[in-house]
């Protein structure tokens, strides 16, 4: 029988639990500047137990997302493969801790602490967008932790497709929900305010999943200040010279411009065993747009 387990990790003394009060999430000092090692923060995760001895599947969401983005595919793949499946909230997202450091080095360090702690290494890392780049960096830095890698609709190559992200953050910051009496009312108001900037209803719905009630107030659980301050880091992959020689799949949406066939030569420079596969009729959120095709591609790569 499949069973969800949910837990927190607190690798450093002094980072205490915050229950569900997102406004009081602990702030970890930034320490990835000047070459010092980033300090990991407590991450929220869900682990779906499995009986197979095969490497666990670890899902990393994209910018503005959360671990819940993968609930359906995680449960389905756990049932189909018998593997353990982990979904994780990145720092400054979902129910994970907030920190002023939003670098890929910091997000990789978070996982370098969490995954061995849970006994899930080596694992199959499956990352979408920002999560894909985090997975790529972790594989380059600590290849012994990654049995194989799947990057979903992202590569290390910079694209112009993310140029609207600053507008998303500005629009979310501008929403005033002080007079709203219910979460449904706050979401309706926020949707109306965001519509003038974000025409895509699916993107607005993704952003609205981050609207929560804290102490009678409606707030964004995302750390928008950290995202805004370090968006340039999120949109740019760190310069690396290492290579990851494990099996690697770059899975792109056929209707997306984030990952293109022209990126393949640069991808192969860092990931010499990389394959590229296209999911037709899928946009950037491949796992949401075409979940069955997405899971079929994952299963084929695992075979």
Curated annotation (Swiss-Prot):
It catalyses: a 1,3-diacyl-sn-glycerol + H2O = a 1-acyl-sn-glycerol + a fatty acid + H(+); 1-octadecanoyl-2-(9Z-octadecenoyl)-sn-glycerol + H2O = 2-(9Z-octadecenoyl)-glycerol + octadecanoate + H(+); 1-octadecanoyl-2-(4Z,7Z,10Z,13Z,16Z,19Z-docosahexaenoyl)-sn-glycerol + H2O = 2-(4Z,7Z,10Z,13Z,16Z,19Z-docosahexaenoyl)-glycerol + octadecanoate + H(+); a 1,2-diacyl-sn-glycerol + H2O = a 2-acylglycerol + a fatty acid + H(+). This is sn-1-specific diacylglycerol lipase ABHD11. It comes from Bos taurus. Belongs to the AB hydrolase superfamily. Its EC number is 3.1.1.116. The keyword GTP-binding does not apply. It is found in: Mitochondrion; Mitochondrion matrix. Its main location: mitochondrion. The active site is at residues 129, 225, 284. One of its GO terms (biological process) is lipid metabolic process. The diacylglycerol lipase activity can be modulated by phosphorylation by cAMP-dependent protein kinase. Residues 55-290 form the AB hydrolase-1 domain. One of its GO terms (cellular component) is mitochondrion. The modification N6-succinyllysine is found at residue 75. Interacts with OGDH and DLST; this interaction maintains the functional lipoylation of the 2-oxoglutarate dehydrogenase complex. Keywords: Hydrolase, Mitochondrion, Transit peptide. GO terms for molecular function: carboxylic ester hydrolase activity; lipase activity. Catalyzes the hydrolysis of diacylglycerol in vitro and may function as a key regulator in lipid metabolism, namely by regulating the intracellular levels of diacylglycerol. 1,2-diacyl-sn-glycerols are the preferred substrate over 1,3-diacyl-sn-glycerols. The enzyme hydrolyzes stearate in preference to palmitate from the sn-1 position of 1,2-diacyl-sn-glycerols. Maintains the functional lipoylation of the 2-oxoglutarate dehydrogenase complex (OGDHc) through its interaction with the OGDHc by preventing the formation of lipoyl adducts. Phosphorylated. Residues 1-22 form a transit peptide. It comes from the Eukaryota.
């Amino acid at each position: 029988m499949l069973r969800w387990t949910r837990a927190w990790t607190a690798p450093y003394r002094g980072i205490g639990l915050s229950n569900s009060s997102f406004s009081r999430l602990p702030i970890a000092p930034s320490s990835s500047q000047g070459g010092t090692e980033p300090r990991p923060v407590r991450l929220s995760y869900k682990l779906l137990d499995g009986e197979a001895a095969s490497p666990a599947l670890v899902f990393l969401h994209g910018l503005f997302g959360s671990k819940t983005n993968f609930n359906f595919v995680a449960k389905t793949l756990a049932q189909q493969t018998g593997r353990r499946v982990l979904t994780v909230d990145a720092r400054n997202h979902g129910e994970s801790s907030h920190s002023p450091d939003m670098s890929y080095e910091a997000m990789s360090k978070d996982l370098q602490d969490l995954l061995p702690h849970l006994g899930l290494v080596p694992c199959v890392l499956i990352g979408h967008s920002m999560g894909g780049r985090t997975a790529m960096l972790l594989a380059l830095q600590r290849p012994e932790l990654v049995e194989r890698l799947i990057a979903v609709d992202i590569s290390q190559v910079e694209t112009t497709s993310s140029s609207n992200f600053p507008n998303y953050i500005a629009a979310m910051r501008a929403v005033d929900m002080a007079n709203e009496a219910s979460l449904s009312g706050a979401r309706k108001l926020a949707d109306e305010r965001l519509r003038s900037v974000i025409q895509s209803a699916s993107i607005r719905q993704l952003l609205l999943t981050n609207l929560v009630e804290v102490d009678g107030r409606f707030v964004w659980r995302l750390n928008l200040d950290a995202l805004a301050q370090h968006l340039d880091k999120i949109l740019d992959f760190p310069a690396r010279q290492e290579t990851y020689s494990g099996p690697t799949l770059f899975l792109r949406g056929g209707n997306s411009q984030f990952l293109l066939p022209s990126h393949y030569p640069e991808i192969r420079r860092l990931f010499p065993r990389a394959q590229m596969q296209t999911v037709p009729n899928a946009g950037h959120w491949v796992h949401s747009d075409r979940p069955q095709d997405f899971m079929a591609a994952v299963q084929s790569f695992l075979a």
